């Protein structure tokens, strides 16, 4: 359990319920979230920002933009619930903002799965200072 939490801290971002986000990414991609996406490209990970390097990195960019649109909850602190039914993520919140937060995380997990073919190991530990400024969300 502790290992999964540590992995989650290094995930696509520090925002959101990291435990749930990590589980979603693992369920959708089959990849270790911290190792595969914790510092991927210009947008995945804690310090992520910049012009996306590829479609995988673009998933992380869109995820950060999704978080910026949330109002009424704190993606850095608030937790949500979801279930995994028939290999599908189902967000199960009554609170509209927490449901949107869950949907943001669901979208990035699905996007990463759909773009597994663009995953490039050379971007796994990409140095963020070399990233160019991205367009605003």
Curated annotation (Swiss-Prot):
SMART domains: PA2c
Site (Hydrophobic membrane-disruption site (MDiS)): 127, 130
Consequence the record notes for mutating residue 126 to A: No change in myotoxicity when injected into mice. No change in myoblast membrane permeabilizing activities. Important decrease in bactericidal activity. Decrease in calcium-independent damaging activity against EYPC:DPPG liposomes
Outcome, altering residue 123 to A: Important decrease in myotoxicity when injected into mice. Important decrease in myoblast membrane permeabilizing activities. Important decrease in bactericidal activity
Site positions for Important residue of the cationic membrane-docking site (MDoS): 121, 124
Activity regulation behaviour: Suramin inhibits both myotoxic and muscle-paralyzing activities. Chicoric acid inhibits myotoxic activity. Zinc ions inhibits the myotoxic activity and the neuromuscular blockade. Heparin inhibits myotoxic activity.
InterPro entries assigned to the protein according to its UniProt record, in alphabetical order: PLipase_A2, PLipase_A2_Asp_AS, PLipase_A2_dom, PLipase_A2_dom_sf, PLipase_A2_His_AS
Outcome following mutation: residue 125 to W: No change in myotoxicity when injected into mice. No change in myoblast membrane permeabilizing activities. Decrease in bactericidal activity. No change in calcium-independent damaging activity against EYPC:DPPG liposomes
Expression sites (tissue/organ): Expressed by the venom gland.
Main location: secreted
Phenotypic consequence of residue 99 to A: No change in myotoxicity when injected into mice. No change in myoblast membrane permeabilizing activities. No change in bactericidal activity. No change in calcium-independent damaging activity against EYPC:DPPG liposomes
Signal peptide (UniProt feature, chain positions): 1-16
SUPFAM superfamilies: Phospholipase A2, PLA2
Keywords, ordered alphabetically: Antibiotic, Antimicrobial, Disulfide bond, Heparin-binding, Myotoxin, Secreted, Signal, Toxin
Site positions for Cationic membrane-docking site (MDoS): 128, 133
Keyword Secreted appears in the UniProt entry: yes
Keyword Ion transport applies: no
Purpose of the protein: Snake venom phospholipase A2 homolog that lacks enzymatic activity. Shows local myotoxic activity. Induces inflammation, since it induces edema and leukocytes infiltration. In addition, it induces NLRP3 NLRP3, ASC (PYCARD), caspase-1 (CASP1), and IL-1beta (IL1B) gene expression in the gastrocnemius muscle, showing that it is able to activate NLRP3 inflammasome. It also damages artificial and myoblast membranes by a calcium-independent mechanism, has bactericidal activity, and induces neuromuscular blockade.
Subunit structure, as described in the record: Homodimer; non-covalently linked (probable alternative/compact dimer conformation in solution). Binds to heparin.
The name this protein goes by in its record: Basic phospholipase A2 homolog bothropstoxin-I
Naturally occurring in which organism (per UniProt): Bothrops jararacussu (Jararacussu)
């Amino acid at each position: 359990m502790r290992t999964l939490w540590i992995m989650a801290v290094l995930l696509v971002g520090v925002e959101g319920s990291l435990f749930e986000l990590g589980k979603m990414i693992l369920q959708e991609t089959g990849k270790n979230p911290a190792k595969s996406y914790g510092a991927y490209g210009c947008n995945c990970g804690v310090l992520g920002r910049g012009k996306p390097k590829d479609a995988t990195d673009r998933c992380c960019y869109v995820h950060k933009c999704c978080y910026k649109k949330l109002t009424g909850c704190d993606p850095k602190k608030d937790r949500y619930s979801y279930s995994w039914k028939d290999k599908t993520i189902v967000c199960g919140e009554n609170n509209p903002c927490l449901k949107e937060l869950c949907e943001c995380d669901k979208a990035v997990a699905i996007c990463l799965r759909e773009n597994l073919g663009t995953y490039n190991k050379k971007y796994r530990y990409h140095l963020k200072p070399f990233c160019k400024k991205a367009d605003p969300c």
